[in-house]
Amino acid sequence: MPEHSEAPDQPLPHPWANRRMRGSEMPRRSTTHPWATRGPVPPEGRIPNPVLSERFSAQRARPVARRRDEAEFELELLAESDSAAVESDPEADTGRGSGRSARSRPSVRKLGGGLVEMPKVTPLDPRAAVLTDPEVHEIKRFCWKCDAPVGRRTTDGPGEISGTCAACGSPFNFRPALGPGELVAGQYEVQGCLAHGGLGWVYLAVDRNVSDRWVVLKGLQNPLDFEAHVVALAERQFLSEMAYPGIVKIHNFVKHASGGRDIAAGYIVMEYVGGRSLKKMLDVLAPQRIPVAEAIAYLMEVLPALDYLHSFGLAYNDLKPDNIMVSEDEVKLIDLGAVAALDSYGSIYGTPGYQAPEITETGPTVAADLYSVGRTLAALMLELPVERDGNLAPVIPSPEQEPLLRRYPGLHRLLCRATEPDPRRRFPSAYAMYCQLVGVLRMVLAVDSGREHPQASAEFASILGDFGIDTLIGQTDRVIDGTQRMPMVDVADVVAALPAPLIDTEDPSAELLLPLLRGDPHQVLDALRRTSARIAAGVVAEPESFELEGALAAAQAHIELGDVVQARALLDELAPRHADDWRIEWHLGVAALLDGDFELGYRHFDTVHSMVPGEIAPPLALAAAAELMLQHLDEPGDPDRLHDAAMEHYRTVWRTNHGVVSAAFGLARRLAADGELLEAVAVLDEVPAASRHHAIAQMTGSLLLVSRPTAEITERDLDTAAARLTALPDDPRTLQLKVIVVGAAVEWLRAGAQPARLQSILGFPVTATGLRQGLESSLRALAQIAPDRWHRYRLIDLANQVRPRSWW
C-alpha cells in the first residue's frame, strides 16, 4: 500500500504567532491553518469524515466512556531503559535494523517559549525498548465488545490469555498477533512488542523499503471488533493527511493475516518516537515530581498540537503523561488511538482520572481535551490523591494542602479553571489556555529565579498609568507647606491606571469597532451611536458580536467619564447572556471601585483573576482593592487578611514585571506597615533607573531608612539615606528630605550613638554642632521657597531653635 506523504523536515513556525483568541474555538473551515503561518491545508485533510461520524453515531445513542490501559502506548519497557531519539540520518550505522544516526542538534533545546531548558535525553538503541515477555496484565484485560473483565485469575489458577467472554460470548485473545521477524505487507519487519494499548498491541518494526527506518505498527486487539476498526480508520483518514511536528506521523495503513487467523488485521504504521514518556520521567523521579517550570513547558508544547487537531474538527481524548514523549529535541503526542470527531457519539476512549466527567454526556469536545491538559499538568507536579480503584481522584488540592500551590497561587487558579466541573467555565480554546500558561510560567520563573519575566499581555492594553507613587513621600510635603497628609491611595488614580481589556483582533466586530475606539470617551460614545444608527438603517451589516463588543466599548467610555450608573446598566444587561465573558466582570469591578464599593470590586477582580490567571492586571487590581478596603473602612472585618492579600498580589505583579512601578510602591507600603522598613527599601531599590519614578523611589527609600525608631537606626542607614539624596537632582522634595535625614542624624547623636567611620552627612560634619548647623541652614533654605508666609515664619523659628548656641 503506498505511503502517505510525511511532514516536512523543517519545523513549522509556531502556530500562535501574532494571534489571540477569546471566544470558543470551533473547527475551522478555511483553506489555511487558523494562524495562517503554514501552507494551505488540503481540503480532504481538514473536513471531518461524515461517514465516520455517522458510524460513530450509529453505534450508540449516547457515548459510553471506556477504560484504556494505564500503560497505553507508553512503550512500557522504557521503565527499564531510556530509548533513542527517533529520526536519524541515513549515512551512519547504529546496528541491524537501522542505518541512520542522529541528526546534528543544538546542544541545548529550550521549551516554554525559550524560557525553560529541555532536560538531556540519552539516545539508546530502539531495540532496547522491545518487551522480552509481552503480556497484558490481568487487571487490564477487558472484553472488546462489552467491556466486561475477562482473563482474570480464579481459584483454579491464572486467567486465560485467550478464550470467550462469559458475559457476551465474544472471543478474546491477548497474545501478540505478530512475532519477531514476521514481515508485514512485504515491507515491515517486526522486531517485537513495545506495549499494549487500549486498541491492541504496539510493535517495533523496520521499514525495509525506506532506508531501514524504525517504525511502529499499531494493531487491533481483535479483528472482529468493528468499532475498533472504525477508530483505526479514523486515524488513517483524518491523520494521515496531516503533518504537525508535535504529533506522531502516520506513514501507512496496511492489512496482514498472521498467527493462523483467517481474518486480516489492520495495522497503522507510524514513526517511532523514542526518548522518555512523561510517565517514565515520573517513575524515575519518584517520589519527587517534575519541576513546575519544566512541567508547564511540556504542556506548552502539547497545546499547539491539540489545537491543530481541534482546527480540523478532532479531539485527542486521551491526554496523560503516558502519551507525551520527550526525545532529545522535541515533545510529541504519540497515541492517536482515541482521536475522534468533535461532538461525535459512540465509544469514547480515555483514562479515568484524566478524562472530563461530562464526556459521556457531551462526547468529545475542546473543553474535555483542555480538562485533560489540566489534569496532566497537575499529575506531573503534584502527588494527587488516588481512589480505591487506583485511578487519580478528580480533585485539585487546595493551597492549604499543597505547599507548591501556595508558592505559585497563579498556577492553582489555572489548574482550577482548566478542570472546572462545568465545561463552560474552562478555557474556551487551546490557544486561550496557552496564553495563560505562558503568563503563569513567567510568574513561576520570577519566583524561582528572583528575576522579572515580563511579557506583553494577550488580553489587556499596556499598563501606562500609576497610582500610590507619592503616598509615602507625599507626607514629607508637610515640611514645606505645613499641611497634614494621610498616606492614602487615591481611587481615581487606581481606576485611571488599570488597563482596559483588548478587543480580539479576529473578532467579527473588530474591523468595525477598532477605528471608533481611538479618541476621548465622548468621541467614542458619539461614534458608537452613529454606527448603531447606520446598522439599524441597513447601511452597514451588523457583525454577530456587535451587541456585546459595542456595549463593552460604551461601558468603558462611561467608566472613563465617571458615569458609573450608565456603565453598570450596560454591563448588567450583558451579564445574563454572556456570563462566561470575564471582561464584564472586569468592568463591573472598576465601576465598583469608582462607586466606593471596594469589597464588591475585589470580588469581581478575583473572578477575573481565576479566569485569566496568567495576566498581571487582575492581581494589581486585587491588591489596590484590598488596600482601598483597609484605608477606607473604619472597622475592617479582617484587616490581616486584606493586608496579606494586598501584599501577595503586589508582590506577584512586581516580581513578574518591574515595569509596573505601582506594584513596587504598593508592596513597599505594605512592608512598611508591617514594620519591615529595610525590606521595603530593598523593593524600592529595584525600580529601574530608566523609570520616571526612580527618583521618587530613591527618596522614599531614604525616608524609610530614617523612619525607624532612633535606637534602630544605624550609621550605615544614615550614610545610605544621605548618599541617595546626594545623587538626586535638586528639587523641593530633595530639600525636604535633607531636613528629615539631618534631623534624624541629630536625634541619633543625641541618643548617645557614636559614629565609627561616618565623617559627614550631606556635607555637614557628624558632630552635634555640625549637624545642628546643617539642619539650621536646610530649614532656612526651605523657608525661602515655602508657599505660605506663615509657614515660612514657622520654618525660620524652627531654624533658630536648632542652631547651636553662640555668642552672636
Regions found by a protein language model. Name each.
Residues 191-198, 202:
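Protein kinase glycine-rich loop
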Residues 261-277:
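Conserved short submotifs of the Hanks-type protein kinase catalytic core
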Residues 447-554:
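Regulatory extensions appended to serine/threonine kinase catalytic cores
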Residues 203-204, 211-222:
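Glycine-rich ATP phosphate-binding loop
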Residues 224-241:
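AlphaC helix of the eukaryotic protein kinase fold
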Residues 302-314:
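Protein kinase catalytic-loop region centered on the HRD/HxD motif
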Residues 249-266:
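Short beta-strand micro-motifs within the conserved protein kinase catalytic domain, predominantly
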Residues 298-299:
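Activation segment signature within eukaryotic-like protein kinase domains
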